[in-house]
C-alpha cells in the first residue's frame, strides 16, 4: 500500500475511539471541511458512535458528515443505488421458482455466534458459500475446498451461482456484497484529506479492496483496531491484511477498562496466539478481582450491573433460562425478559388503582393486553373499536372506564390478573416484583455472546467457559484464543 498511512493499535479500553475523534478534532481545527473527512467501518455501531461523538464535540449534524458511513452504505450511495435495485424477498421467491429450488435469501450466518449456520432450507447454504467466496476474493472451487463441507454438491453450487448471476443481470438487481464489489470495480472515490478506517481487523479481503480505492484518493489514512480482537475469521476475515496494512504503527499504551487482575488473565490467554502483533500496554490502576465459580447460583447478582457472556447463542439461552429460574430480571440480545408493554400495562393499572388519570394511548395499551373472554375477562368483548372514536386528548379514571368504556375489573384486582399471561410468566413476574425490580427500566443483567458484546464493558462480567466440539477441534486455535 503506497499511500500515507498509520496503523493505530487499540487494545481493550485504551481509548481508540477517543484517539480517532481527536484526529477529527485536529483536522477541523486546521480548517479541514467536514465533508473532506471520511470515517468508515464494517459495523453500523462503530460509525454511529463516531457520528454521535463528533456531532456532540463539534456541533455537527450527520448531514454535514457525508462520509461517516459503513462501507455498505458508502457503496450504496457511491453507486447511485435505490431500494428497488436490491434483491428483495420477492426476488428470492422468483429466483426460487426459476431454479426449482427454495431460497429464503437470508445469508446463512450468525455474527453473534461466530459460526456459519444452515438455515431451514439447504439451498441457502449454497448462497452463503457463494457470498463468502466473493468476500474472500477466491474462486468457488477454492471456497468449496476450504470449507470441506462435502454435504454440498459442487456442481449444484456452480449451477446456483450461474443462475443467480443471470437473474441479477436480467433484472438489474444487486446484493449487499455487490455494493462493495461494484464500488471496487468503478474505482472512483471522494477526495478526502483524512480517511479513518475503524475496527479494521474485522474487514474481509473484498472490503480491504474498497478501502484501498478510498485510501488512494485520501491525503492520509488511519487504520484502527486490534488483531487480538479479530474474532470474525469465520466470515472470511484475513487478519494478516490488518497486521500488514501500514509500516507506521502506534500502540495506545493505557487501558481505562481492564483492572490488573483481568489484564493478567487476558494476557495469559493472548500469549497463546501465534500470529499476532506484539503490543505492550498498561492496565487500570485498580486491582479488580477474578473468581471462578461452578455456576451462576453461587453468584450474588442482587446488586450492580452484570454482563454474562457465552460462546454461542445456544449457551446464552441456557444462561438466560437459569436466570429466569432464579427469578432474576435480565435482557438477552437487547430484549428484556419481560416485554416493555407488559411492564407499562402493570404501571398503568396500578396508577388507576391509585386514582391517577390516564390518556387514551394508555387505555389502548392496557386494553390491548387484557383478557376479554372467558371467566377471566376484565374488559367487555367488542369494546376496542369504540376507543377509536374517543378524543385523542381525553383523560380517564378507573370510574369513567367502568361507566363508559367496558372495564369489568374490580379496583382491587391484581395487576397480573389484568393481563393475558401464562402461568409460568405470571409466577416469574411476581417473583421480580417481590424483588422490587423496576420492569420499565433496562435490566441490570445482560446476557450475550462474546461476539455480540465485543467492545462492550460492565462493572461485573461473567464468562461461561462452555464450548462446542467444533470450537475445541478447530485446527486454528488462534481463533478460539482470540474469542
For each feature predicted by the language model, list its residue ranges.
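P-loop NTPase Walker
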Residues: 1-85, 267
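Accessory N-terminal region flanking or inserted into the helicase ATPase core
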Residues: 1-10, 18-19, 36, 106-196, ...
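Conserved helicase C-terminal RecA-like lobe
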Residues: 350-483
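Conserved helicase motor core of SF1/SF2 NTP-dependent helicases
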Residues: 11-14, 42-45, 69, 201-287, ...
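Conserved interdomain hinge at the start of the Helicase C-terminal
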Residues: 289-304
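Short, polar/flexible loop-turn hinges at active-site or ligand-entry regions and domain interfaces
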Residues: 32, 36, 57-65, 79-94, ...
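Conserved beta-strand -> loop -> alpha-helix junction used to position metal-binding or nucleic-acid-contacting
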Residues: 63-80, 328-354
Amino acid at each position: 500500500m503506497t499511500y500515507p498511512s498509520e496503523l493505530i493499535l487499540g487494545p481493550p479500553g485504551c481509548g481508540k475511539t477517543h484517539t480517532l475523534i481527536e484526529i477529527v478534532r485536529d483536522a477541523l481545527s486546521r480548517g479541514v471541511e467536514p465533508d473532506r473527512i471520511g470515517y468508515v467501518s464494517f459495523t453500523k455501531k462503530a460509525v454511529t458512535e463516531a457520528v454521535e461523538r463528533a456531532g456532540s464535540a463539534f456541533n455537527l449534524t450527520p448531514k454535514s458528515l457525508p462520509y461517516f458511513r459503513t462501507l455498505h452504505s458508502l457503496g450504496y450511495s457511491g453507486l447511485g443505488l435505490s431500494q428497488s435495485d436490491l434483491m428483495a424477498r420477492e426476488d428470492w421467491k422468483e429466483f426460487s421458482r426459476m431454479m426449482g429450488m427454495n431460497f429464503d435469501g437470508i445469508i446463512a450466518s450468525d455474527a453473534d455466534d461466530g459460526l456459519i449456520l444452515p438455515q431451514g432450507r439447504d439451498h441457502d447454504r449454497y448462497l452463503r458459500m457463494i457470498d463468502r467466496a466473493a468476500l474472500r476474493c477466491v474462486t468457488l472451487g477454492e471456497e468449496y475446498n476450504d470449507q470441506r463441507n462435502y454435504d454440498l454438491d459442487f456442481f449444484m453450487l456452480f449451477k446456483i451461482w450461474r443462475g443467480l448471476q443471470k437473474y441479477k443481470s436480467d433484472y438489474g438487481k444487486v446484493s449487499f456484497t455487490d455494493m462493495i464489489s461494484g464500488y471496487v470495480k468503478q474505482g472512483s472515490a471522494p477526495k478526502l484529506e483524512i480517511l479513518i478506517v475503524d475496527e479494521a481487523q474485522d474487514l474481509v479481503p473484498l472490503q480491504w479492496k474498497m478501502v484501498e480505492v478510498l485510501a488512494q484518493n485520501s491525503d492520509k489514512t488511519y487504520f484502527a483496531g486490534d488483531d487480538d480482537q479479530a474474532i470474525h475469521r469465520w466470515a472470511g476475515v484475513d487478519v494478516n491484511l490488518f497486521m500488514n496494512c501500514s509500516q507506521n504503527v502506534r500502540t495506545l499504551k493505557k487501558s481505562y477498562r481492564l483492572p490488573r487482575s483481568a489484564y493478567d488473565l487476558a494476557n495469559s490467554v493472548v500469549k497463546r496466539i501465534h500470529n499476532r502483533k506484539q503490543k505492550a500496554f498498561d492496565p487500570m490502576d485498580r486491582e479488580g478481582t477474578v473468581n471462578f465459580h461452578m455456576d451462576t447460583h453461587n453468584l450474588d447478582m442482587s446488586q450492580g450491573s452484570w454482563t454474562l457472556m457465552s460462546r454461542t447463542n445456544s449457551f446464552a439461552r441456557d444462561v438466560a433460562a437459569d436466570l429466569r429460574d432464579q427469578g432474576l430480571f435480565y435482557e438477552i440480545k437487547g430484549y428484556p425478559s419481560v416485554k416493555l408493554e407488559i411492564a407499562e400495562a402493570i404501571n398503568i393499572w396500578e396508577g388507576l388503582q391509585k386514582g391517577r388519570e390516564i390518556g387514551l394511548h394508555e387505555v389502548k395499551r392496557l386494553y390491548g393486553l387484557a383478557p376479554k373472554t372467558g371467566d377471566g375477562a376484565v374488559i367487555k368483548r367488542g369494546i376496542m373499536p369504540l376507543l377509536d372514536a374517543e378524543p385523542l386528548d381525553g383523560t380517564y379514571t378507573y370510574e369513567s372506564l367502568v361507566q363508559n368504556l367496558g372495564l369489568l375489573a374490580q379496583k382491587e384486582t391484581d395487576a397480573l390478573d389484568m393481563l393475558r399471561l401464562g402461568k409460568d410468566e405470571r409466577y416469574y413476574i411476581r417473583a421480580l416484583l417481590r424483588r422490587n425490580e423496576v420492569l420499565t427500566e433496562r435490566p441490570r443483567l445482560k446476557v450475550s455472546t462474546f461476539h455480540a458484546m465485543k467492545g462492550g464493558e460492565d462493572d461485573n462480567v461473567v464468562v461461561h467457559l462452555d464450548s462446542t466440539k467444533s470450537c475445541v477441534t478447530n485446527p486454528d486455535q488462534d481463533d478460539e484464543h482470540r474469542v
